[in-house]
């Protein structure tokens, strides 16, 4: 008798995706982040659902409702901080997942890569709107500053901003629609994740060597299920350490003050995971130029498959490209640091140089180094 797992229409899909999936035998811990991102998404949807049961999206009561969740709801403080720090864990996993893709040349799977970039944009939009919901000082001013960037669009900019706001400033209408979008987007993200996996399973996983691994495949279960469980345990451990010992480590103290349109915080800055893009935005004196640089800092990821000039897929055997890659990582860390600093000397010039270096590495240095390596290997 054939196994139900292999014949039942629904169980068959799960079987081909998570149990009998042929996987390369040599994928390292860098391949764990896909499953960790799935876990993060589940945690965020569940904690978010329970928060939404007690939250009110009204300017008068939003801040108080978050306070009520933390003080009066059973384990409300735990749910709230798991959701806030879960977002940070989500972005840590996202950045490492994208970094892995860049290092090992996984971007040569066009469809999977491009869906991944759309996912990155969607998650960033969701996180931004979620940050507005507690209606603290940084929520309000962050929303004002970031939505205002759209006014840089010629001709329709101002109208567009007022349309998004639902009025002449960030107010009740803005908060209500942001809550609605923040609620629906994770489900859209879930659908996109399924498409992401669908395209991935068309080609099979890449592996550290970048070579075709069809001749040496092993079943996903039990080998990679047990490996994923280790990653999951470490992720939960890290998240709970953050939540239970220093829940406000990555937050902004200004957000514990209710939103006040009449008083601007001394330094308006987004959450840490947007600081690199914020630094690039601020490094250009022109408003429209800054907005374009901000968008292209993420969109540039779509060019990687076109800029891949090396004859080898992975960077595993390309020491020169490895050096350039780690300089890019250091540059992104520098941009993250600069994004959190005030706009004054020497931070301005450091930010500008780091921004130039970021685009130069991706568009110029990495492709050039790849060609040099080809020549050195007489390819």
UniProtKB/Swiss-Prot annotation:
Q: How is the cofactor bound?
A: Binds 2 heme b groups non-covalently.
CDD domains in alphabetical order: cytochrome_b_C (cd00290), Cytochrome_b_N (cd00284)
Q: Which InterPro entries does UniProt cross-reference here?
A: Cyt_b/b6_C, Cyt_b/b6_C_sf, Cyt_b/b6_N, Cytb/b6-like_sf, Cytochrome_b, Cytochrome_b_C_euk/bac, Cytochrome_b_N_euk/bac, Di-haem_cyt_TM
Q: Which GO terms describe its cellular component?
A: mitochondrial inner membrane; respiratory chain complex III
**Keyword set for this entry?**
Electron transport, Heme, Iron, Membrane, Metal-binding, Mitochondrion, Mitochondrion inner membrane, Respiratory chain, Transmembrane, Transmembrane helix, Transport, Ubiquinone
- Residues binding a ubiquinone are 201
Residue sites binding heme b b566 per the record: 97, 196
Any one Gene Ontology molecular-function term assigned to this protein's record: ubiquinol-cytochrome-c reductase activity
Q: Which GO terms describe its biological process?
A: mitochondrial electron transport, ubiquinol to cytochrome c
Which parts pass through the membrane? 33-53, 77-98, 113-133, 178-198, 226-246, 288-308, 320-340, 347-367
Subunit (UniProt): The cytochrome bc1 complex contains 11 subunits: 3 respiratory subunits (MT-CYB, CYC1 and UQCRFS1), 2 core proteins (UQCRC1 and UQCRC2) and 6 low-molecular weight proteins (UQCRH/QCR6, UQCRB/QCR7, UQCRQ/QCR8, UQCR10/QCR9, UQCR11/QCR10 and a cleavage product of UQCRFS1). This cytochrome bc1 complex then forms a dimer.
Biological role stated in the UniProt entry: Component of the ubiquinol-cytochrome c reductase complex (complex III or cytochrome b-c1 complex) that is part of the mitochondrial respiratory chain. The b-c1 complex mediates electron transfer from ubiquinol to cytochrome c. Contributes to the generation of a proton gradient across the mitochondrial membrane that is then used for ATP synthesis.
Further comment:
Heme 1 (or BL or b562) is low-potential and absorbs at about 562 nm, and heme 2 (or BH or b566) is high-potential and absorbs at about 566 nm.
Of which family is this protein a member? Belongs to the cytochrome b family.
Q: What is this protein called?
A: Cytochrome b
Q: Which organism is it from?
A: Spermophilus citellus
Q: What is the lineage of its organism?
A: Eukaryota, Metazoa, Chordata, Craniata, Vertebrata
